[in-house]
Amino acid sequence: MNSVFEIVSLARRKNKLQRELDDNEKKVRDNRKRVELLVNLLDYIKPNMSHEEILGIIKNMKSDYEDRVDDHIIKSAEISKERRDISRRIKDLTEHDKQMTQGKKA
């Protein structure tokens, strides 16, 4: 009976991780769009506009967004790994439970 509760718990955790993964992928996509926007802004702003500070700010923002994209990619990989581990554990528990059930019937 404990294995049933563990299977349910692991399945719920796996589903939660999938939702987190989907959310994280959305964040990666959104931040990539922001990086592209900032690259385009850098193309339009010229030094003769006497806005050197603006260029510096935009470059810093671009770097920050790129760092966020990298962080989200790493987080996605970690979440995916945990989901795979949970899937394996659920499979093992299910097989073990089947063997135990079949052993009792025999």
Curated annotation (Swiss-Prot):
User: Do the record's keywords include Coiled coil?
Assistant: yes
Question: Sorted alphabetically, which InterPro entries does this protein's record hold?
Answer: DUF496
**Keywords per UniProt:** Coiled coil, Cytoplasm
Q: Which Pfam families match?
A: DUF496 (PF04363)
Q: Name one GO cellular component term.
A: cytosol
Q: Which residues form a coiled coil?
A: 7-34
Q: What is its main location?
A: cytoplasm
Q: Where in the cell is it found?
A: Cytoplasm
Q: Which PANTHER family match?
A: UPF0265 PROTEIN YEEX
| Similarity annotation | Belongs to the pole-localizer TmaR family.
What this chain does, per the entry, is described as:
Pole-localizer protein involved in the regulation of several cellular processes.
Report what the protein is called: Pole-localizer protein TmaR
Q: Which gene encodes it?
A: tmaR
